[in-house]
Amino acid sequence: MSAKKQKGRRPPVWVSQNFLTSHKTIERVLRRTNLRADDHVIEIGPGKGHTTGRLLQKCRKVTAIEIDGKLYAGLLEKFSDAENLRLHHQDFLKWKLPFSGRYKVFANLPFCYTTDILRKLTESKNPPVEAWLTMEKGAAKRFLGKPRETLRSLLIQPKFDLGIVYYFRREDFHPKPGVEVINNAKIKLW
């Protein structure tokens, strides 16, 4: 199947999934966040769990949503003893966000779903207090309204503080992404 959307069908996640595998980079990115020991963090697409393990050490509760069956099974095995992990085998776009309570989001987004996921997070009745999202540079700039405002940037900016906090190297991922630069965008509720 082509990576392009076909008549309302979404491409499979694997067509745009690049796993963040550099442990040094994961540590660098996590140090730049405001994640604390008492936080509840929702991780979208934990993949092989490279970041999940660090989130479990750093935060009170981690809820991870993984759509891929093989990756989900691997996560179940890898984190079988983790008491502060709630793991869901589900499509995040169909998963219900918490109706109440504070939570933060950390995600290495599949590039073809960035807009859909960002829309779900920002249009929720109980949006995250912060979201740390790894996305393609061009998408991040569009959400920031650079070089010019877009409808999406105009809708997001009044309620959320957006910014780029880290530029990745392609070598930080496997497989290496085909896009020029990957970055981590911070979205904070005003």
What label would you give each PLM region?
Residues 1-190:
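Catalytic cores of RNA-modifying enzymes
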